[in-house]
């Protein structure tokens, strides 16, 4: 026979073959202090859990998206940041170019709205090329993450919309106004209430409204998945926020980068 144990249990076999199962106090087992996060093993555990949260959101986005641009071309990203917009994890299937642009977009959202004007039910949106990825088809959405009433980070996603109005696949536009609909930094969802006026404007200005709206809803769903998983991590390990993890990730990343640069032979490099 097979005995299946929960993750918070331990088992021993006594001399006569009986199974002694003990339920472990998960609060004592999982609690990480600030110093422990710097431990390589603990950092690896937490960091991989955050990456897994982004990966799960990306898988959901792919399954739920309407357009082939996202579903087959993988022209999207899912990112988790700390409360200052510093990147903690990006989904493994996200395209590399967004790894630098999306955290910057989150920082622009923070500067535009300020943290005190954000609520747990908010979702922010923009496709401003100067605050986003450089062109209008990439729509970025961002959700503030709260734990115990405190802003602890952001989940964010960028996806290339199948259409955003304007001229189709043409190098002719000389101004951004010819490229399509511009969405300034707005609250697409304000404290749980969808901005239907904005959605109507968006639908009326694109050629494939169902696909554009469907992809956008898939992005919003992905934000919610990242929100839930991050709060699960914080509760499981009794962390108040992501600040200590963020510091540890940045320190480890800086160290690895410096080591790689140090390994480069001296010389003149051109690109």
What residue spans do the PLM features occupy?
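C-terminal, non-catalytic interaction/recognition modules in large multi-subunit enzymes and RNPs
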Residues: 1-271
């Amino acid at each position: 026979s097979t005995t299946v144990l929960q993750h918070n249990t331990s088992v021993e076999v006594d001399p006569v073959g009986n199974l002694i199962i003990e339920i472990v106090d998960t609060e004592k087992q999982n609690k990480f202090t600030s110093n422990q996060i710097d431990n390589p093993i603990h950092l690896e555990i937490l960091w991989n859990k955050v990456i897994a949260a982004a990966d799960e959101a990306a898988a959901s986005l792919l399954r739920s998206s309407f357009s082939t641009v996202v579903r087959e071309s993988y022209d999207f990203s899912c990112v988790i940041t700390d409360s200052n917009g510093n990147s903690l994890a990006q989904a493994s299937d996200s395209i590399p170019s967004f790894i630098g642009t999306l955290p910057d977009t989150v920082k622009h959202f923070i500067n535009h709205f300020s943290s005190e004007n954000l609520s747990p039910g908010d979702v922010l949106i923009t496709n401003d090329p100067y605050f986003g990825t450089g062109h209008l088809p990439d729509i970025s959405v961002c959700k503030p993450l709260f734990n115990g009433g405190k802003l602890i980070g952001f989940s964010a996603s960028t996806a290339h919309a199948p259409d955003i109005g304007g001229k189709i696949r043409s190098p002719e536009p000389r101004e951004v106004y010819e490229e399509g609909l511009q969405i300034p930094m707005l609250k697409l969802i304000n404290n749980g209430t969808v901005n239907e006026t904005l959605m109507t404007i968006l639908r009326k200005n694109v050629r494939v409204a169902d696909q554009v709206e469907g992809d956008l809803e898939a992005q919003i769903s992905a934000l919610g998945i990242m929100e839930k998983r991050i709060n699960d991590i914080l509760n499981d390990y009794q962390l108040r926020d992501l600040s200590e993890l963020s510091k540890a990730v940045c320190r480890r990343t800086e160290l690895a980068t410096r080591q790689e640069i140090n390994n480069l032979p001296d010389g003149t490099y051109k690109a």
